[in-house]
Amino acid sequence: MRADARKNYDLLIEVARDVFVEQGAEASLRDIARRAGVGMGTLYRHFPNRDSLLEAVLRSRFAALTARAESLLLAADPAAALLEWLAESVAFTHQHRGIIAPLMSAIDDPESALHSACVALRAAGTSLLTRAQQAGLARPDLSGEELFDLIAALAWLREQPS
């Protein structure tokens, strides 16, 4: 990638991250391009659709949550590690309003731009859950899919009007 193209790509990611946090996942792509100081053509050259932009924005955060889960696998208390990761995951969903519907549909859609990021996030939580279950500190009948659904449900509740 040319240096100027890379600069625009990185700038679009940075601006989109802020706009998605401020306005939610359905924020205007035109607003993102305007705030980044680029044209719509530049945005679409890098990101052909909203899902690809959202996936790029979320990729770094998912990687951080995955890395956090991996580091928590070494924690002395598997239940506390699982709860800490769960709290961080829920906090992330609260920062990014409107991502739950796309995430829940992407987890089952291998064609979605968000699919691989969702699968990695669920696998990270499943590893922590399995460790807590093996220590007898979590219900043995709870699955990684149900844990992912719990995160989604908590985020969905947060998005509902009071």
Predicted regions and their residues:
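Amphipathic alpha-helical packing segments from all-alpha helical-bundle domains
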Residues: 63, 102, 109-152, 159-160
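Amphipathic alpha-helical interaction segments
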Residues: 11, 80-88, 120, 146-150
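Short amphipathic alpha-helical interaction/hinge segments
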Residues: 93-104, 155, 159-162
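Basic, helix-initiating cap at the start of DNA-binding domains
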Residues: 1-34, 52-55
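Helix-turn-helix/winged-helix DNA-binding modules
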Residues: 24-25, 45, 139
